[in-house]
């Protein structure tokens, strides 16, 4: 049975993406792993919390997802992986929740996630990577 690797990608942070490329490529070589890339876009209530009106200022969620998928597919081209082993997922909502849900669904043998070095807000609020490490049912590689 082939291993399955989940790689959450923040499409707005190319520096983090650069950090995980070599790790994903090396892990994917083992057993010709299937690699599932995921990006998560905030749900519409998040935008409303910023004071933006739903209809007047925001594109439709389907348009946001299509644009996010296009950006993620461009990012994936940087990885040297067989295209028949790559899967693309775009979800809406809380990144940590969507990562954990997809990890269970596919099911993932490993999650490779990039993370910034902790700062004061991380200690107060927690990070997505920390939540994934705490709650994932598979191995998690955090790349800093």
Curated annotation (Swiss-Prot):
Any Pfam family: Usp
Domain of life: Bacteria
CDD domains: USP-like
Biological process terms in GO annotation: cell adhesion; regulation of bacterial-type flagellum-dependent cell motility
Transmembrane stretches, start-end: none
Coiled-coil intervals, chain numbering: none
Gene Ontology molecular function: ATP binding
Gene3D superfamilies hit by this protein: HUPs (3.40.50.620)
Protein family per UniProt: Belongs to the universal stress protein A family.
Database matches in PANTHER family: STRESS RESPONSE PROTEIN NHAX (PTHR46268), UNIVERSAL STRESS PROTEIN F (PTHR46268:SF18)
Subunit details: Homodimer.
Protein name: Universal stress protein F
């Amino acid at each position: 049975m082939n291993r399955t690797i989940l790689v959450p990608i923040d499409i707005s942070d190319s520096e983090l993406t650069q950090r995980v490329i070599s790790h994903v490529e090396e892990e994917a070589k083992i057993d010709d792993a299937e690699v599932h890339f995921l990006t998560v876009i905030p749900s519409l209530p998040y935008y409303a919390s910023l004071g933006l009106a739903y209809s007047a200022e925001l594109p439709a969620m389907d348009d946001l997802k299509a644009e996010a998928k296009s950006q993620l597919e461009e990012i994936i081209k940087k990885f040297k992986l067989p295209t028949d082993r790559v899967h693309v997922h775009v979800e809406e909502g809380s990144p940590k929740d969507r990562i954990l849900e997809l990890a269970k669904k596919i099911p993932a043998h490993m999650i490779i996630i990039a993370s910034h070095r902790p700062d004061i807000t991380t200690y107060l609020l927690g990070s997505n990577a920390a939540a994934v490490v705490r709650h994932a049912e598979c191995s998690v590689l955090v790349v800093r």
